[in-house]
Swiss-Prot record:
ATP-dependent specificity component of the Clp protease. It directs the protease to specific substrates. Can perform chaperone functions in the absence of ClpP. Zn(2+) binds at residues 15, 18, 37, 40. This is ATP-dependent Clp protease ATP-binding subunit ClpX. One of its GO terms (cellular component) is HslUV protease complex. Residues 3-56 form the ClpX-type ZB domain. One of its GO terms (molecular function) is unfolded protein binding. ATP binds at residues 120-127. Component of the ClpX-ClpP complex. Forms a hexameric ring that, in the presence of ATP, binds to fourteen ClpP subunits assembled into a disk-like structure with a central cavity, resembling the structure of eukaryotic proteasomes. The keyword Cell cycle does not apply. Belongs to the ClpX chaperone family. Keywords: ATP-binding, Chaperone, Metal-binding, Nucleotide-binding, Zinc. It comes from the Bacteria. It comes from Sphingopyxis alaskensis (strain DSM 13593 / LMG 18877 / RB2256) (Sphingomonas alaskensis). One of its GO terms (biological process) is proteolysis involved in protein catabolic process.
Length: 423
């Protein structure tokens, strides 16, 4: 469109889309009776690229990634847990294969298989779910089950999970309906008592009931601005039928329930009291059955919505040492990169890595505790580093990890002397 400038007789041209004048943009392209500026062209290109990119885009031919391809990608970021990776890879492949063939009108309708991850704290449950979503390029959100309550009670509504998924897809409902939801700490919403109670359990059984419909597939009415503060807002309708739900939890004490079942343990006078099981918790969890989850406090309908169960083992010293150094985004690699930015090399000796792993096992924090241990070791060094001159390398050995000495600083002149001696 053309508007006349009030200050002079010359006409000023304006973008038909954003309304900016030719003086406010770099380029204005003319069409029959319309104009478009370079900024709007760039925005349109971004929108088109985003639309093309949407969906499961791990392969160029558009096919759903095979279980082997999914598992190989998980191997690059997650150490160990091979059984859990295989279970996840098959379940996710089948889920997105089901979506790819959903519109063909065949007689056999494929049901959705949500996934339950059971394993100790710091064994990699959350990392597996995050890595999967990143590889598949689908919207992903995490929810903490401990903050959820039934609608109408103080706490977070279950529908807020779908709102977070919508936000991660930029409110693209179509994309959100093919996303992945990871619900952490699912064991914390177990029923407080094994038998149903007449009192209302709004953060336990009540949340399980509220999650049931979402997980099996329903049309959820989601408030774009959050639950209760904006009652007049229009609701978005999101079909959860094709959203993959992955639930994870440590289920502390579940191994005892499994052990009791396996031993057929009786209760009362004269009952055989079993000694402590020498096997690690992860080994016992491999023999999990749905009835064990019911005894733990999950309701039957909820267990039924999670037909695929993958168990993770607690990590030993060897696995934690590998986690420190082997994955693409390994912790040691991250700190080396930080030191590289200061033009200083960072070296961890092999015995230092073993000592860090042993500390994490003592704290019973698994892989999650590794960062806090390494951070504590390097804190003072990182504080001083920007002001240090002539330091070319920081060396961390076993004595440093165990607190017997500070990280060793190697200065430029000593490094030159060492190089000369070696020659």
């Amino acid at each position: 469109m053309t508007k006349l400038s009030g200050s002079d007789s010359k006409s000023t041209l304006y973008c038909s889309f954003c309304g900016k004048s030719q003086h406010e943009v770099r380029k204005l392209i003319a069409g029959p009776t319309v104009f478009i500026c370079d900024e709007c062209v760039e925005l349109c290109n971004d929108i088109i690229r985003e639309e093309i990119k949407g969906g499961v885009a791990a392969r160029k031919d558009g096919a759903v990634p095979t279980p082997l391809e999914i598992c190989q990608h998980l191997d690059a970021y997650v150490i160990g847990q091979n059984k859990a990776k295989r279970v996840l890879s098959v379940a996710v492949h089948n889920h997105y294969k089901r979506l790819a063939n959903s519109g063909r009108g065949e007689d056999v309708e494929l049901a959705k298989s949500n996934i339950l991850l059971v394993g100790p704290t710091g064994s990699g449950k959350t990392l597996l779910a995050q890595t999967l979503a990143r590889f598949l390029d689908v919207p992903f959100t995490m929810a903490d089950a401990t903050t959820l309550t039934e609608a109408g009670y103080v706490g977070e509504d279950v529908e807020n999970i779908i709102l977070k998924l919508l936000q991660s897809s930029d409110y693209n409902v179509e994309k959100a309906q093919r996303g992945i939801v990871y619900i952490d700490e699912i064991d914390k919403i177990s029923r407080k008592a094994e038998n149903p109670s007449i009192t209302r359990d709004v953060s336990g059984e009540g949340v399980q009931q509220a999650l049931l419909k979402l997980m099996e597939g329903t049309t959820a009415s989601v408030p774009p601005q959050g639950g209760r503060k904006h009652p007049q807002q229009e609701f978005l309708q999101v079909d959860t039928t094709n959203i993959l739900f992955i639930a994870g939890g440590a289920f502390a004490g579940l191994e005892k329930i499994i052990g009791d079942r396996l031993q057929g343990k009786s209760i009362g006078f004269g009952a055989h009291v079993a000694g402590p099981d020498e096997r690690r918790a992860g080994e016992v969890l491999k023999q999990i059955e749905p009835e064990d989850l019911l005894k733990f406090g999950l309701i039957p309908e909820f267990v039924g919505r999670l037909p695929v169960i993958a168990t993770l083992e607690d990590l030993d010293v060897d696995a934690l040492v590998k986690i420190l150094g082997e994955p693409k985004n390994a912790l040691v690699k991250q700190y080396k990169k930080l030191f590289d930015l200061e033009e200083v090399a960072l070296t961890f000796t092999d015995d230092a890595l073993v000592a860090v792993a042993k500390k994490a096992i003592e704290r019973k924090t698994g892989a999650r505790g590794l960062r806090s241990i390494v951070e504590a070791i390097l804190l003072d060094t990182m504080f001083d580093l920007p002001d240090l001159t002539d330091v070319v390398e920081i060396v961390v050995d076993k004595d440093v990890v165990e607190g017997r000495k500070d990280p060793v600083r190697v200065y430029a002149d000593k490094a030159k002397e060492a190089a000369g001696d070696a020659a």
